Regions:
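Non-heme Fe(II) oxygenase catalytic core, chiefly the N-lobe of the double-stranded beta-helix
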Residues: 1-227
Length: 227
């Protein structure tokens, strides 16, 4: 079992946030260029803890947000949602009590319908409600590791279809993005994926985009996905 508790960091402070995942990072200002040494430790903390929280930051300008994101790799642009003017990599979310929809109402892995899904997502919060509106996270390493060895072996040989048309069609019409302007990608991914850097295995299915396990009948697929 992977245990990140003994990791030592020299340029940042890392405080474990919860037993199963997440850590709070202090000692770094994301509104400025992050040093190579600090970034290396942030990347290591990301691999160790999966979700990182940077509290009480100065506002991060869009260009700095994009610059920091590019340190992790090529940035993804959302195939359907309207993006920030001048920054196609940034997807702005506005929701109030009167909004017809709120992004991410159900458990999902962001844009898993893409052929090459994003490594992760960077959120910068500007206006928060006094209560509610929580963003929740789940550790899919632990989800896999909690399964019996027989079920792990069974799932390891399967693939799943991830689709987006049922999610994206009509979703952004009230924000000036017509269906004719969007892409609705579809992809097939292994049900169990191995992280290329940590070597850990994780479940890679979700309620929002995963529509079928391909090697099973429709009824068998439904039963497994609803477990």
């Amino acid at each position: 079992m992977f245990d990140p508790t003994n990791s030592d960091y020299k340029t940042i402070s890392v405080k474990r946030f919860a037993p199963n995942l997440g850590a709070e990072i202090t000692g770094v200002d994301l509104s400025k260029r992050v040093s190579n040494d600090q970034f290396a430790e942030i990347k290591r903390a990301f691999l160790d803890h999966q979700v990182l929280f940077f509290k009480d930051q100065n506002e991060v300008a869009p260009e700095m947000h994009v610059m920091f994101g590019k340190r992790f790799g090529v940035l993804h642009s959302h195939p359907a949602a309207p993006t920030m003017k001048g920054y196609p990599e940034i997807f702005e979310i506005h929701a109030t009590r009167d909004s017809k929809i709120a992004n991410g109402e159900f458990w999902h892995s962001d844009v898993s319908c893409d052929q090459t899904p994003p490594l992760g997502t960077m959120l910068q919060l500007h206006i928060l409600p006094s209560c509610g509106g929580d963003t929740m996270f789940s550790n899919m390493y632990s989800a896999f590791e909690s399964l019996s060895e027989r079920l792990q072996a069974f799932l390891s040989g399967l693939t799943a279809t991830h689709e987006s048309e049922h999610i994206y069609r009509g979703r952004y019409n009230d924000r000036g993005k017509n269906d004719s302007e969007i892409d609705c990608p579809r992809a097939v991914h292994p049900v169990i994926r191995t992280h290329p850097e940590t070597g850990r295995r994780a479940l890679f299915v979700n309620r929002t985009f995963t529509t079928k396990i391909n090697e099973l009948s429709s009824e068998e697929s439904r039963c497994v996905l609803e477990m």
